[in-house]
Structure formats: structure tokens, C-alpha cells
Amino acid sequence: MNKIKMIVGLGNSVYKYNQTRHNVGFWYINMLSSFYKTSLKFKKKFSGYVSSFFLNNNKIFLLKPDLFMNLNGYSVFALSSFYKIKLSEILVVRDELDLSPGILKVKYGIGHNGHNGVKSIINTFEKKKPFIQLCIGIGRPEFKKNVSNFVLECPSKIDTINIKKAILKFIFLTKDYIYKKEFLKNKKIILI
């Protein structure tokens, strides 16, 4: 496994989706860029908002694709190709229906669990190599509600608080070693 050189938050670029469950990957990138005092700037050639910061002399790029979720892979591929970053050096941050709000899970592999943004990344890269995902729990809808509608709705106030607390705790827990290989071995679920 390689060191992390790029962190991408998956989401839909349309403004009305900013605070929805499906955009928690964007929430993560916004909070991380704020934590490291770096600002995201739109870069047309990468179809997304890009920034970078140094952590213990290791440069880490941040990316928020400016595309719909099912096209996020194109933005990820454009930035990673330009800077010669392998898929295995990318941390993909995304929402996860199978985890409750406030629970995070790091997973390593090539599975997408039905997530269209992750599918887009897998389909865009020629070599199907394992990569790291930070799955942010958003919970499942009650009473078999339509999942597509559920992920495009804003979470409740308490769920929003739990999700943001979990993100912040993860940022604090990983700030000293996210660039190290040891980070990749940690697949624990974090309860907040």
C-alpha cells in the first residue's frame, strides 16, 4: 500500500445538493481545507475545486469534483493523471447508507457497494487497483423509502451534528499520520 497523496470528497456539484446526505464527501473536504487553512479554487482542466497542503513535508491534494456524482471519476482521473498520483494513493470520501450517522469506516479494496461516485472512479481508471475509502454513515431511510430521494435530502439537525462531529474527530485523529502507510492499516469503525 502507498501513502495518501490526494483526498477526494464525492458529491453533486449543483448548489441545491450542498447540504444533502449524498454530499458529505464535500462536507469533509470543506472542513479539512478549513482545518489546514487552505482554500479550494476551481480548476477547469480538473473539472473541480482543488487545493493542497503540506503535512510533515508531504504534499496532499484536495479535490471536490464539479460534476454530478456519477461523473466524479473523470475529475479524479484528471487531477491524479496530471500529478502522477496512483489510485492506491487516493483517499475517497463518500456517504454510506449502511452506517448510522456519526459512524465512519475506513475500507480498502475495489468495492463500490452500489455507490455511483465510486463506480465512476472504478470505471474511469484503466487498472482496477484497490484504493482507500472513508465511508461516512448517513443511515438508511425508514419504511423502505426511495433511497435516491433519501440521499438527496438534507439530514435532520441531530444527524448533521453527528456527521460533522465524526468528520472533525477523524480529522483530529489522523492529522499526524494520514500520510503514513500505517494509516492504511486502520480499518476500524469510529463511533462518535
Curated annotation (Swiss-Prot):
- Its name, as the record gives it, is Peptidyl-tRNA hydrolase
Q: Which InterPro entries match?
A: Pept_tRNA_hydro, Pept_tRNA_hydro_CS, Pept_tRNA_hydro_sf
Q: Which GO terms describe its cellular component?
A: cytoplasm
HAMAP family assigned: Pept_tRNA_hydro_bact (MF_00083)
| Role noted for this protein | Hydrolyzes ribosome-free peptidyl-tRNAs (with 1 or more amino acids incorporated), which drop off the ribosome during protein synthesis, or as a result of ribosome stalling.
Tell where it localizes. Cytoplasm
KW RNA-binding (keyword) present: yes
Any Gene Ontology biological process = protein quality control for misfolded or incompletely synthesized proteins
Q: Which residues form a coiled coil?
A: none
Q: Which UniProt keywords apply?
A: Cytoplasm, Hydrolase, RNA-binding, tRNA-binding
* Gene3D superfamilies xrefs: Peptidyl-tRNA hydrolase (3.40.50.1470)
Residue positions annotated to bind tRNA are 17, 68, 70, 116
Q: Where is this site: Stabilizes the basic form of H active site to accept a proton?
A: 95
Query: How is the quaternary structure described?
Result: Monomer.
Signal sequence range: none
Task: Give a yes or no for keyword RNA-binding in this entry.
Answer: yes
- Identify which residues the record assigns to the active site: 22 (proton acceptor)
SUPFAM superfamilies found in the cross-reference section: Peptidyl-tRNA hydrolase-like (SSF53178)
What family is reported? Belongs to the PTH family.
The protein's Enzyme Commission number: 3.1.1.29
Q: Per the record, what are the reactions this protein catalyses?
A: an N-acyl-L-alpha-aminoacyl-tRNA + H2O = an N-acyl-L-amino acid + a tRNA + H(+)
Chain positions of site Discriminates between blocked and unblocked aminoacyl-tRNA: 12
Q: Which organism is it from?
A: Buchnera aphidicola subsp. Cinara cedri (strain Cc)
